[in-house]
Amino acid sequence: MTVEKSYYMTQEGKDKLEEELHYLKTDRRQEVVERIKVARDFGDLSENSEYDAAKDEQAFVEQRITQVEKMIRNAVIIENDNDNPNIVSLGKSVSFVELPDGDEETYTIVGSAEADPFEGKISNDSPMATSLLGKEIGEEVTVTTPGGDIDVRITNVE
C-alpha cells in the first residue's frame, strides 16, 4: 500500500479546493459533455478537431477532479497555535526587508497546494520559507535561492 502525500493548507485553502471541486463536478464537467455532443454532430470523428479538443479537455477536467479530491482527502489543516506570536510558522504572514536597504515584502507561508506567489502566498517548501520558518522578528537570515544568497531582516509576523 502506498502512503499518500499530505497537503498542508489553511482552512481557507481547503474551502477553495472544495469550491473548485464542486464547480468541476457540476458546471465544468457538463460544459465539456455538451461540447463533445456538439462536436459529434460535425460528422466524421477521425478528422474532427473540435471533437479531439473536447475529449482532451474532458481528460484534463477528470484529471483535475482526481487531483483535487486527493488533495482534499489528504489535507492537513494548518493551525496557528504557536505560543510565541513573534516566531515565523506555517500559516502566518511574515514581513521582511532585503538588506542592506531593500523594500519591505510580506508573504504568507502556506502548504505547496495553496501556494500562489502572485497572491503573496509562498510554499513552506520554498527556499525563502524554509529559511524563515522558526525565526523571530528582528532576526537576520540568509536565504539561499537559485539566483544567489539574499540577506533579509524579519520585521513582522502575524
UniProtKB/Swiss-Prot annotation:
<keyword id="KW-0804">Transcription</keyword>
<dbReference type="GO" id="GO:0003677">
    <property type="term" value="F:DNA binding"/>
</dbReference>
<comment type="similarity">
    <text>Belongs to the GreA/GreB family.</text>
</comment>
<protein>
    <recommendedName>
        <fullName>Transcription elongation factor GreA</fullName>
    </recommendedName>
</protein>
<dbReference type="InterPro" id="IPR023459">
    <property type="entry name" value="Tscrpt_elong_fac_GreA/B_fam"/>
</dbReference>
<dbReference type="GO" id="GO:0006354">
    <property type="term" value="P:DNA-templated transcription elongation"/>
</dbReference>
<dbReference type="InterPro" id="IPR006359">
    <property type="entry name" value="Tscrpt_elong_fac_GreA"/>
</dbReference>
<dbReference type="InterPro" id="IPR018151">
    <property type="entry name" value="TF_GreA/GreB_CS"/>
</dbReference>
<dbReference type="InterPro" id="IPR036805">
    <property type="entry name" value="Tscrpt_elong_fac_GreA/B_N_sf"/>
</dbReference>
<dbReference type="Pfam" id="PF01272">
    <property type="entry name" value="GreA_GreB"/>
</dbReference>
<feature type="coiled-coil region">
    <location>
        <begin position="47"/>
        <end position="75"/>
    </location>
</feature>
<dbReference type="Pfam" id="PF03449">
    <property type="entry name" value="GreA_GreB_N"/>
</dbReference>
<dbReference type="InterPro" id="IPR022691">
    <property type="entry name" value="Tscrpt_elong_fac_GreA/B_N"/>
</dbReference>
<dbReference type="InterPro" id="IPR001437">
    <property type="entry name" value="Tscrpt_elong_fac_GreA/B_C"/>
</dbReference>
<dbReference type="InterPro" id="IPR028624">
    <property type="entry name" value="Tscrpt_elong_fac_GreA/B"/>
</dbReference>
<comment type="function">
    <text>Necessary for efficient RNA polymerase transcription elongation past template-encoded arresting sites. The arresting sites in DNA have the property of trapping a certain fraction of elongating RNA polymerases that pass through, resulting in locked ternary complexes. Cleavage of the nascent transcript by cleavage factors such as GreA or GreB allows the resumption of elongation from the new 3'terminus. GreA releases sequences of 2 to 3 nucleotides.</text>
</comment>
<dbReference type="GO" id="GO:0070063">
    <property type="term" value="F:RNA polymerase binding"/>
</dbReference>
<keyword id="KW-0175">Coiled coil</keyword>
<dbReference type="InterPro" id="IPR036953">
    <property type="entry name" value="GreA/GreB_C_sf"/>
</dbReference>
<dbReference type="GO" id="GO:0032784">
    <property type="term" value="P:regulation of DNA-templated transcription elongation"/>
</dbReference>
<keyword id="KW-0805">Transcription regulation</keyword>
<keyword id="KW-0238">DNA-binding</keyword>
